[in-house]
Curated annotation (Swiss-Prot):
Keywords: Chaperone, Cytoplasm, GTP-binding, Nickel insertion, Nucleotide-binding. Residues 1-24 are annotated as: Disordered. The keyword Repeat does not apply. The keyword Membrane does not apply. GTP binds at G26, P27, V28, G29, S30, G31, K32, T33. Belongs to the SIMIBI class G3E GTPase family. UreG subfamily. The gene is ureG. This is Urease accessory protein UreG.
């Protein structure tokens, strides 16, 4: 199914509130691009969306989102970071800040700017200059112990997504243990168990973005 047609926009923002910038991070293969695709498809009818993807040497994630019809091609921008992925979202986020500016020049009435980081380790976090909300994605296939390994992505992100719950029996992971460890490491910060390929848990992520991002009163 093709993404819906969006009408042409003027170059001046007409909405009172600034766009919400949502950073999506996590290790390689955890499901970041899948989450971004599902979020775009779930929210594009109600919100004006644009997406920015980060890869080190290619624009593969941009291509995947475009082929999947997550959004019209012009609303998806790929950024080649050319180095450590975490640098482009934290220490020197200028390349992504420039990408955000370019997208908002094209689509000044965007409600949400999704920014997907390149795959990285558990220490990666988004600069507060770049992201208003951060979602960190890990997956069950990475091992039952992943939540208790900690790191800023697991302990400090606004929402932790534990993806691929359907693989737990195949890798010998206990989901109850993972949930308990996530709660211990995160305290009051929320987390959600997901099987994104089956859309299981996606509604929780959407509602979190809407509530935390003040998109709905």
């Amino acid at each position: 199914m093709n993404a819906p047609h969006h009408p042409a926009h003027s170059t001046v923002r007409t909405k009172k509130l600034p766009p919400l910038r949502v950073g999506v991070g996590g290790p390689v293969g955890s499901g970041k691009t899948t989450l971004l695709e599902m979020l775009c498809k779930a929210m594009r009818e109600q919100y004006d969306l644009v997406a920015i993807t980060n890869d080190i040497y290619t624009k593969e994630d941009q291509r995947l989102l475009t082929v999947a019809g997550a959004l019209p091609a012009e609303r998806i921008m790929g950024v080649e970071t050319g180095g450590c992925p975490h640098t482009a979202i934290r220490e020197d986020a200028s390349i992504n800040l420039e990408a955000v500016d370019r997208m908002l020049t094209r689509f000044p009435d965007a409600d949400i700017v999704f920014i997907e980081s390149g795959g990285d380790n558990l220490a990666a976090t988004f600069s507060p200059e770049l992201s208003d909300l951060t979602i960190y994605v890990i997956d069950v296939a990475g091992g039952e112990k992943i939540p208790r390994k900690g790191g800023p992505g697991i302990t400090k992100s606004d929402l932790l997504v534990i993806n691929k719950t359907d693989l737990a029996p195949m890798v010998g992971a206990n989901l109850e243990v993972m949930a308990a460890d996530a709660k211990k490491m995160r305290g009051e910060r929320p987390f959600v168990m997901c099987n994104l390929k089956a859309l299981d848990g996606l509604d929780v992520v959407v509602k979190f973005i809407e509530k935390k991002g003040l998109l709905k009163v």
